[in-house]
Amino acid sequence: MKRLPLILLSLTTLATMVFCLLRQGARRDHSDLVTLARSGAAETCTRFSDNQSHGDDGDDWGGVAAFRTFQQACALLPEQGSDAVCSAVYGQLLHPDGAKAHLPEIIAVMELLAQDPTDASARLRLYELRDLLQEDA
């Protein structure tokens, strides 16, 4: 009976330590996902900017691939919710003829997302981009 409080205290301490370790790992994973989303958005900007300057189709498809990286990272971020908007934009980017007419808008939105992929106003601009791309589809 006298050992029961000591055992409970030890188990509580152990559980607290495990919780803290798991929480640190989750924070690190979140930071890694944000970094991946940022780099995907930045690479999308670079590729589409190069395509706009030089007209190389390889840059166009590289931009689509970079957007896919951004999309997958955002899908794993808890604050992003559904990735339906990213899927819709990605689907429109797969048809480069329609997307080429809106390269300046795509670049502008992705520059915002490259700064902070969790920013609500940048996310709103992504919704507007989706609507713009779907109008021309």
At which residue positions do the language-model features occur?
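Alpha-helical segments in soluble extracytoplasmic regions
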Residues: 36-95, 124-128
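Transmembrane signal-anchor/signal-peptide helices with a preference for the extracytoplasmic
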Residues: 16-35
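N-terminal cationic amphipathic segment used for targeting or macromolecule association
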Residues: 13, 35, 118-120
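Sequence-pattern detector for short linear motifs
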Residues: 5-6, 26, 41
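Enrichment for repetitive, rod-forming helical segments
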Residues: 9-10, 45, 130-132
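C-terminal amphipathic alpha-helix
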Residues: 98-137
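Hydrophobic membrane-insertion alpha-helices, especially the h-region
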Residues: 3-22
